[in-house]
Amino acid sequence: MPQPDSVKARLAALDRIDDELCAVLQHAQATIGALAELKRGHAALQPQLEQHVRDYYRTLEHSTVALRNEIRELDAAVGTQLLPVNIGKRAVGQDQEKLSEQLAQMDKYVGSM
């Protein structure tokens, strides 16, 4: 069953956000690695550490904004595309009957011990 274009667009946007979040983790790893080397006395890595930190925050900000926009888009879609959904409740009372049946079986089992 083919998906509507709006769904394809949302999935593509979420895929890009996922890639950006992976990049955030890679920048965090590079930042921590550079910081560890800097603590070991490699002072020449200071500019590299600063660049990793800038990349981390830039990517984090971009992915956060994109995710917030997708959430806003989903909120808008809920009111227009997804709802109203008619839900007819069926089998009313079966859950209570099943619960009573299970409790009776447990009473029999516990009583026979």
Curated annotation (Swiss-Prot):
Belongs to the Mediator complex subunit 11 family. It is found in: Nucleus. GO terms for molecular function: transcription coregulator activity. Gene3D superfamilies: 1.10.287.3490. The gene is MED11. It holds the Pfam family Med11. InterPro entries: Mediator_Med11. Component of the Mediator complex, a coactivator involved in the regulated transcription of nearly all RNA polymerase II-dependent genes. Mediator functions as a bridge to convey information from gene-specific regulatory proteins to the basal RNA polymerase II transcription machinery. Mediator is recruited to promoters by direct interactions with regulatory proteins and serves as a scaffold for the assembly of a functional pre-initiation complex with RNA polymerase II and the general transcription factors. Keywords: Activator, Nucleus, Transcription, Transcription regulation. Its main location: nucleus. This is Mediator of RNA polymerase II transcription subunit 11. One of its GO terms (biological process) is regulation of transcription by RNA polymerase II. Component of the Mediator complex. It comes from the Eukaryota. One of its GO terms (cellular component) is mediator complex.
